[in-house]
Amino acid sequence: VTRAFDCDVLVVGLGPVGAALSALLARQGVSTIALEKDLDIYPLPRAVHFDHEIMRLLQKLGLADSMLAVSRVARAYEFRSADGQILMRYEQAGQSSPSGWPASNMFHQPTLENQLRGVLAGSPLADVRLGVTVTALAQDDAGVTATVSSANGDQTLRARWLVGCDGGRSTVRTACGIELSDYGFDEPWLVIDAMVHDASRLPVDNLQICDPARPTTCVLSGEGRHRWEFMMLPGETPDQVLADDFIQGLLAPWNVAGAVSLERKAVYRFHGLVAQSWRQGRILLAGDAAHQTPPFAGQGLCSGMRDADNLAWKLAAVIRGSADPALLDSYQTEREPQVRAAIELAIAMGRVVCITDRQAAAQRDQAMAAQQAAGIRPPPPAPLSIGPGCRLEGSAGAGELFPQPWSDDRKLDAILGDGPWLISKANLDSPALKPFAGDLAGWLQARSAEAVLVRPDRYVFGTGTPDALSTGWQAWTGSPSPVLEPVPSR
């Protein structure tokens, strides 16, 4: 007797990535059971930065305004020498982003997790189970069976698909025997989170202090918090640097005694790792289970959330029966180049910051200060395109992030709904598109395109004639073309 399915997708791990994936799947009508070994949300700050693209994803889940209210928009990111000279200043405030949201947002991770779980609590399709550990996995042609253990004993759960969102030490990845490829960047740092009592005594910008005696990061966190990260030096042990008097010594030059109180201290090894395979049959990996990055570019959490957005609509298309499961192979081919670019940027920044040789540091300072003096500013990072996969190869704009124009307080995504969308020059004066017609016409014109098909994760499938786009989309997803006339979302 074949066992009935308990749900469509088992999500293992309910950090931000698992919670976002479950919420996105529920929106697509896919049932999930999310398993989390901890009974409570991890109460202390971890990730502190997300970008405009993640705010746009949160907008889809109805959380953008509530997260914006408790986040702080980063004004600038400065690299300074040991004596305080500005080596590079990257202005972030007032930067227009393709999504219309602030380019750089500093936040408190437990707050985000609470808000995401609130979305799940309101969805009949999402079943959250806390205090549950996965002890064994088995898969066959039809589904995955997980043996799980909790205070109520052991049981088995059966699902069509399983996604491991269970972090850097992923049980799911280990159970599948998937190896990691390592960038060979491995630096231990002390991370300190503080509650702020007097904000007037703290820096207003995010700082990298390129001090060869001890490279240091000092950044905003969510409302009422600040973070310092100190590189550990050869010979130092975690016990030594975690001692309160040692930490007070590190903070002394910042002159914040009385202005902050310690909330959390932890030693982390910053490294760059990518799982060699993100899919094994009916089991997939997302977030830190699939890749880990040093924090210097603020892209760790962002990368995991992009995974969730890429995977959710594809799983939904396969589960609804229209798409061939091979569509899921495009998940890694599209996301891995994006992830590797983010990791390589973070490591390059880390190598600039982590110089401890005084002579090499002096040369770096001189070179960076000369560029700063000459007015040479780093270009804003271009939104990363997805790699080859579910896109109309060779068409202009394929794989780019499609922008979200705003018209007064109306936003394109909110008007058009979850997608996919087919937007053509011919329908720009429709009531739904008219407020955004100028921006959309400009986008199409820049790519000499008659029409564009935008996927549910807001990446461009391709440009061309509406017929060619419909045919191409159907070949990939099995679903009929999206309606030409976008329907306003209710």
Regions of interest found by a model, annotated:
Residues 130-144:
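A conserved short coil-to-beta-strand element within the FAD-binding core of flavoproteins
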Residues 1-8, 12, 27-28, 37, ...:
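Helical substrate-recognition/capping region of FAD-dependent monooxygenase/halogenase enzymes
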Residues 240-303, 323, 345, 382:
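FAD/FMN-dependent oxidoreductases across multiple families
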Residues 5-7, 152-161:
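Core beta-strand elements of the Rossmann-like FAD/NAD(P) dinucleotide-binding domain
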